[in-house]
Amino acid sequence: MSVALFVRHGKASAFGSSTDYDQLSPPGVEQSELLGAWLAESGIRADSVFVGPRKRHRQTLDAMAAVLASRGAGLPPATELAELDEHDGIGLVFKLLPELASTDENLQAIVAATVRGESPSPDDVLAAFKRITRRWVKGEIGHAEIEPWSAFRARVARALDRIATLGRGKTALVVTSAGPVAAAVATVLGVDDEEKVLDLSWSAYNASVTELDFTGERWGLRTFNATPHLLDRRLITSV
């Protein structure tokens, strides 16, 4: 039996802010370093490392790796997998926001604030994101320039297939985003209610660990969204 430790990236920049979301915040770096320390103290050694293509994925891995190396538990070179990228729900929101705002007062307020040169509140943007993506995963809306939800689910399944080729008795460290973590769990458990997959992704904490095991052709779930390394409650975040 082998194990895959799926890690959601550390806390990124504020959702909906004018700063680059694809960038770890200082708390995100701290979360990642604490995870590296916990892995070292737990005696967990990765035989293979896979990382998503975003800066926040690589920055999370780098922060973990630095701590592990300082404790004599260096990681092997990482393999970047495009299949571990997050879905582009954020891009979808901005593509469809003007059109959808014509029938949604809450969305109209976000558009109006943007037109005035103001930054909408992160809470308003997050609420809009959730409403729009729920419709997206049900196939009610979409955009030609945005990867369909079904294609996102399929590529995460391909990532699982790639990881499963490692063979028995191996441990893989996988650094990605909340969406792929949730999609991987849903694939393993056979969840086909796509809104529930979204709910799983929204519940994922930054720098959390989800542990999957695999033997032959069968995957199993051991733990989901664990944060044993984050003892300070201020570091329990979901951005």
Go through each PLM region and give its residues:
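Extreme N-terminal starter segment of soluble prokaryotic enzymes
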Residues: 1-5
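Loop-to-helix element that buttresses phosphate recognition and phosphoryl-transfer chemistry
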Residues: 10-66, 148-153
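Short active-site segment of divalent metal-dependent hydrolases/proteases
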Residues: 12, 180-181
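Phosphate-coordination/substrate-recognition cap region in phosphate-metabolizing enzymes
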Residues: 37-126
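Short, well-ordered beta-to-alpha junction loops that form the rim of enzyme active sites
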Residues: 53-54, 83, 172-180, 224
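Acidic, low-complexity terminal tails and accessory targeting/binding regions
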Residues: 87-120, 145-146, 150, 165-171, ...
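Alpha-helix-centered segments that form part of catalytic cores
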Residues: 115-158
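GST-like fold's C-terminal all-alpha helical module
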Residues: 152-154, 159-166, 172-178
